[in-house]
Amino acid sequence: MLLKLPEKTCSLTLKPVIERKFHNYINCIEGVYHTGQRDMQRIRISKNAFAAGFRLKHIGEVLYASVKNEFEAVVDKCEVVIYTDPAECTRIRHEVAIPTFNKRDDRLKNLTDESVDVYYSCILCQAFSPSHVCVVTPERLGLCGAVSWLDAKATNELDPNGPCQVITKERPIDERIGEYEDVNEAVKRLSQGALEDVSLYSIMEKPMTSCGCFECICGIEPFSNGVCIANREYAGMTPLGMTFPELASMTGGGVQTPGFMGHGKHFIGSKKFMKAEGGIERIVWMPKELKEFVADRLNQTAKELYGIDNFTDMIGDETVATDPETLVEFLTEKGHPALGMDPMM
């Protein structure tokens, strides 16, 4: 799906906001289900909806009407194009979509959690997980991977009473795990009391909840004293003994699950990733495709924090191990730092 907007009235900061609203718009259609984001989306159309006459063109009509209605102040006209030819979809993905996503992500390179005065909440996914609340910071984007701190800021400026609310960070409780009284109060209010406290930098202590739109799932791997990460595209087995869908079934739903967390791909290379447990040194396995995607930033972070060169070469993938025993052998051979760290449990 390609939504064309007027350049003169629609700013670059607003486009990701509109794009993420597709999730809500499509899920408002009876008999239609949407999940995912960016270039990893899934749309299901029920047999009843199809029998009633629903066709792909109607998705375009819904998007057109919804965008014109909600963003009428800045969008005076728009065009929705739906591509179904696989070759053309692949071309647009690589020539248009991915370069656009990369440009958006690059805007955050010089921002840190310490350099801003406020964070933002995001509850766009509460239609699926009523108790889930994302806390979006410069160094931890929304777990869907599509809502950065700048995107949340733009959403709030456009609609102060909308899905992204300002969260101040003036009353720290435990900066080691990233727990703030202001954040706890916001999460409790926005989750209707289902969640009382949350940390931003820990997978074991009060981890952030997840809905079902996460790009990746991170889970503790006790044999190697580290964590494994699986991305949505990966269909195989992990050393945790579970596939991505199996991990998703126990991680999503807006419930805190110590030892497991959903997150965006770009959070993997962050200096705040699992900071409370030792950071990215804990990463021992991820699918080869994901490892290649995050390699540059992850290697750079490992070099800056620990002086390790080519850290991703120490991380296992499905080509070397999908069971814990073989993984530990590989990590031992590579001298992975997680093997010498304190136990996580």
Annotated model-derived regions:
Residues 1-345:
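Cysteine-centered metal-binding/redox modules
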